[in-house]
């Protein structure tokens, strides 16, 4: 149950009904008033919920705003609602205070729903695909993949808990230029093993990582020099296939270690082998959006983008400054470009597999590709403008002792995901990478991530849970029942208790907002706030030494807190240990 939304809806309905009653009784004139807006005040001493309705509509009601507020408060009927009182503040703010029964209902609801607390039913559930990481299978995954993995996985989880049908997908780029470059790099290293490094020139734009040397050595150990004198095309195909056979399982293993499990691994080669790329380009041509030039087939991207920008209200002058260009779909040599395959892939998502919405997690340096892909899908009649969302993600900077870290101590290469997980826990990695909005860069402090104190944010939250569990365990060892399902919750009146319950009530709304805003980092901040509220409760409210009825109520509150922290952490794949 979403307690925040329910309370806000009740507050809005109370004010609207009070206005209608005042109009019916001739106390206020009938007018086109603005909709009732409800907010949560920063200072809860002013009330739990507030509205500026009286001030916003004073002009059309031809009354002093405070007078309008007085009339509305007088006509409010709080019977059967979650509110105990309505008050006026300042020039005409309407402040509503929650009744104690609301706080009691929150704890009852958490107790009843348990691990399902926080999940809600979407008003309009969608079939959504979240595609993320999709790293080239030509080498180890880097820090951008590490951040994108957590971002995509957590976003998929909150979308699911908010009531949508969600599919996690990894797109394997096993065709095209990068695979050609992968094959030529492996080929050079393979021949260097046999003929010597000086005898074989390494391609200037090849992959220079040590992993290429390792793969080439494995290929040599398996095949010897049997491929040395075979045709280059045959050798490249064998090397690329061998490399992918080794790299893709390694990528899957790293991601599973990182607690990321995909529903679908989709291979680019399937689009080419089934002629789906060719068919997609054919449809674009039939729709009048391509032309031939210099032996290549082009998409009239500049025209499509211009139409899209005009629809958004951009002026001709602004559009001209963008220097829009067209894109090649099929090269003069007959091969299709990556862009053509990408259009076909997204057409498959919508047209073949029937997703209502597709969300891609991309690094911010791909921003120039967003509008081009959307307008290409529009040209296919798939409404890419509205149905395709791209979440752009900023870079990650690893630091240790305040200094940037770029190389692995073990391998001497750029730090890969598996290197990171050798140094810090999966919990720490997932927490840190989900700690900020995707549009903000992340500074990942390796030293901080391994500290076992409250300075480490993941430790701080997990310790609150472990501390809570240890309290309950100690009580049970003293023969005090801790499996409490009901208690006299009216006894919970201390500010630390009520503040904690307020925070516990927010989980369903935080999950909803994380889904709507495409920002799962909200859950990190929320879990930290609950941990802080629990530490305050533990400091100010004794449990063991309290009177039996109050002790029972506080035990139930502690159990609810444990459930909420565990549920919140599970949204972004972090464990909630019972002891630390």
Language-model region placement:
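Non-catalytic interaction-recognition regions
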Residues: 2-104, 115-580
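Short, charged, solvent-exposed linker or helix-capping segments at domain edges/interfaces
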Residues: 105-110
